[in-house]
């Protein structure tokens, strides 16, 4: 038996590039759907659907509270069941079809101004997203134990995710404008470029992450890129006070690129920590409860999104933001928004199906342990697994930062100059100051993470040695 075959027999699988891309297409699909919701739904609700910003902010918080209850139920269900299409991959199709439908309905203006309709569609969409995202997250740790392969998988996944992010951030403004007025105004192109720069660094730096990590180490990589993001945010704040956005558009593009470089690498690589804490949990408890751990990470990032999601609406309401009626960069044509979401959601569904066809689970929980999984395992694992608690705080902080910045980006480029000085300052704080403060907190949190690569490799070898003696 060759060394590679021997390693694969122990669970240290090497994947082909088509398998890596297939796995990453699942995150691309989710970004086409969920990133559209995250970046533009608040704008759609306040400027087109007709909801009060404060009411929309409260709704975003309520949806995240529902997620806190729903996520552990999904994680437990996933760990306890083995659908015939695959323990984790089955849900890409089973959840993907209804998710597509509800995501489209979130951008339908048929019940304009109805808070009840907004709640029903948004809550339902979020619950279905969990039904895909939790097993998809567990799918990563089921493909291999090899830490280098997991790093490549994570880099590929985040590269693909940012393809989706670029399509959403730059593509949605242009597509909506084209569908609404038959052409894309120069102002819309400027906004699309600004939003698109949020994803562009992924294509440059995410393929380099494995090499960067080997050169400087895991923690130092986080410190470096979180600091880069803070510098970019400081530049955005200063430049936005030097004159109008249009007057300083090139400088704003540069600052946005710098900010996005730091954010993308740091928040992209954090997903590689999840398989590590799953292996650590298996090492300490003897059970590989991937669904439970990914349900926990789902709670963490949705808790961050809850905190980050409620902040923009409240800040906008407190500072007296008024929706622009005539000079807005983004069109207010409800039919154009509906058709744009229809296109993106259907593309996302096709990619989920492709991900399903290209993935194969190899490292999963033993059948004898499946029946013993229960919801309380979620909190048992949380309190037993110290590295899991560290990444919990990091996920909450990172996603709060991204949620605040993403939701406010459309306002920053769309109608900053049309607002009162107080409302302008509120938008600047949402885009620059609050996210920068959260990144400083994130740096302190990641300093407490203790699972270096040599420790994880030793843990995985010990797990395999135990399996051979049983």
Question: What is the predicted role of each segment?
Answer:
Residues 2-470:
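Membrane-embedded alpha-helical bundles of multi-pass transporters/translocases
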């Amino acid at each position: 038996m060759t060394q590679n075959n021997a390693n694969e027999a122990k669970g240290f699988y090497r994947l082909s590039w088509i398998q890596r891309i297939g796995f990453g297409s699942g995150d691309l699909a989710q970004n086409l759907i969920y990133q559209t919701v995250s970046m533009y739904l608040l704008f759609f609700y306040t400027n087109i659907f007709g909801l009060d910003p404060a009411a929309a902010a409260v709704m975003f918080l309520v949806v995240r509270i529902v997620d806190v209850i729903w996520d552990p139920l999904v994680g437990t269900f996933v760990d306890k069941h083995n659908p015939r299409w695959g323990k984790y991959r089955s849900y890409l199709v089973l959840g993907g079809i209804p998710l597509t439908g509800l995501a489209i309905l979130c951008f339908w203006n048929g019940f304009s101004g109805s808070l009840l309709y907004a709640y029903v569609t948004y809550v339902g969409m979020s619950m279905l997203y969990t039904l895909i995202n939790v097993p998809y997250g567990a799918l990563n740790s089921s493909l291999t134990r090899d830490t280098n392969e997991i790093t490549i998988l994570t880099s590929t996944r985040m590269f693909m995710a940012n393809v989706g992010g670029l399509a959403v951030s730059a593509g949605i403004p242009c597509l909506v404008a084209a569908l609404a007025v038959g052409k894309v105004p120069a102002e819309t192109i400027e906004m699309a470029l600004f939003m698109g720069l949020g994803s562009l660094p992924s294509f440059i730096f995410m393929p380099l992450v494995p090499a960067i990590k080997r050169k400087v180490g895991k923690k130092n990589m986080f410190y470096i890129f979180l600091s880069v993001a803070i510098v970019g945010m400081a530049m955005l704040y200063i430049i936005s006070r030097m004159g109008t956005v249009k007057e300083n558009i090139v400088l704003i593009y540069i600052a946005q690129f710098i900010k996005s470089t730091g954010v993308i690498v740091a928040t992209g690589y954090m997903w590689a920590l999840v398989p590590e804490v799953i292996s650590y949990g298996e090492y300490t408890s003897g059970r590989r409860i991937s669904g439970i751990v990914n349900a926990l990470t789902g709670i963490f990032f949705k808790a961050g999104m809850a905190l980050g999601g409620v902040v923009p609406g409240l800040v906008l309401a407190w500072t007296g933001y008024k929706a622009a009626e005539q000079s807005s960069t983004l069109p207010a044509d409800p039919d154009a928004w509906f058709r744009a979401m229809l296109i993106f959601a259907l593309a996302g569904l096709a990619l989920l199906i492709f991900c399903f066809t290209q993935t194969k689970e190899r490292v999963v929980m033993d059948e004898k342990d499946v029946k013993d999984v229960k919801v309380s395992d979620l909190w048992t694992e949380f309190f037993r697994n110290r590295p899991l608690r560290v990444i919990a705080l990091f996920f909450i902080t990172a996603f709060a930062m991204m949620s605040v910045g993403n939701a406010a980006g459309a306002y920053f480029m769309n109608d900053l100059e049309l607002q009162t000085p107080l409302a302008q300052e509120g938008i600047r704080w949402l885009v620059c100051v609050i996210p920068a403060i959260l990144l400083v907190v994130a740096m302190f949190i990641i300093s407490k993470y203790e699972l270096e690569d040599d420790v994880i490799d030793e843990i995985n070898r010990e797990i395999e040695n135990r399996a051979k003696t049983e």
